[in-house]
């Protein structure tokens, strides 16, 4: 990896750190449920793509509707029937990975997969008092807020140099089919594991099991999984260090948000 940061890299790092912090601070200040949605989605939107245009916005908006419909209709009707819900979710995953593999609607598939996986994880604990409807509304609100934040930050921290569009790799039908089968199998196994065991506090692991599949190949997923494991180790230790430094002030929103901004800005260096 090139150690030299470009001006655009620094601007993107500022957008990622500020987006995560704004989403976190707003959700906490207004006491909104599921703050993980409000913190994660700005990171995804500002981290996966370095630009913001109509095609990206349409995909992101579509990713608010698809997971909500899947959770309310598919899981709402068949969630209590494991032998029915598992193949239905597998078909849903296959459709989304197919969109990603084709490339044109990659972001729609990626955003939908993350939102769907998180909501399915929480929805499986509806008997423990988690309201599915409030969960879906919270997810939609987080996506819309992430768009607003992204708009604002692209104005405040715009690119300083023109970006060269990435070349599109041509894929044959066999390659697409292989990627869809591989990723769908892994995602469905992850879904089954998190539905079977009591892992209500393991939402980050659920999200990670989907995020590592974004390269759409075994080698890429393996490398991504290793990097994510290292990132989790580093991130958790940095968070503990921040808690140790803040001590009794860790419950103060300003200090918690400021420490989050510093840590995300530091870690985003490894992403851009």
What are the residue ranges of the model-derived segments?
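Alpha-helical transmembrane segments and their membrane-interface boundaries
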Residues: 1-112, 116, 120-262, 266-272
């Amino acid at each position: 990896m090139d150690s030299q940061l470009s001006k655009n890299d620094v601007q993107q790092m500022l957008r990622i750190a500020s987006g995560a912090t704004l989403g976190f601070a707003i959700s906490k200040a207004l006491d909104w449920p599921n703050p993980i949605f409000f913190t994660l989605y700005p990171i995804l939107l500002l981290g996966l793509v370095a630009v913001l245009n109509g095609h990206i916005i349409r995909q992101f908006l579509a990713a608010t509707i698809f997971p909500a419909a899947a959770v309310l209709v598919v899981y709402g009707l068949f969630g209590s029937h494991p032998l029915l819900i598992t193949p239905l979710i597998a078909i849903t995953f296959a459709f989304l990975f197919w969109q990603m593999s084709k490339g044109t609607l990659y972001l729609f598939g990626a955003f939908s997969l993350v939102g769907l996986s998180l909501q399915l994880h929480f929805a499986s604990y509806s008997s423990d008092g988690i309201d599915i409807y409030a969960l879906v509304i919270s997810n939609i609100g987080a996506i819309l807020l992430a768009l607003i934040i992204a708009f604002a930050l692209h104005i405040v921290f715009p690119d300083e140099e023109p970006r060269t569009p990435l070349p599109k790799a041509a894929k044959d039908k066999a390659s697409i089919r292989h990627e869809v089968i591989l990723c769908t199998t892994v995602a469905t196994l992850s879904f089954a594991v998190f539905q079977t065991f009591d892992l209500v506090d393991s939402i980050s692991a659920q999200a990670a099991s989907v995020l590592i599949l974004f390269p759409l190949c075994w080698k890429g997923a393996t490398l991504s999984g290793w990097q994510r494991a290292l990132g989790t180790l580093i991130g958790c230790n940095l968070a503990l260090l921040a808690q140790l430094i803040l001590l009794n002030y860790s419950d103060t929103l300003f200090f918690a948000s400021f420490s989050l901004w510093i840590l995300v800005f530091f870690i985003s260096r490894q992403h851009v």
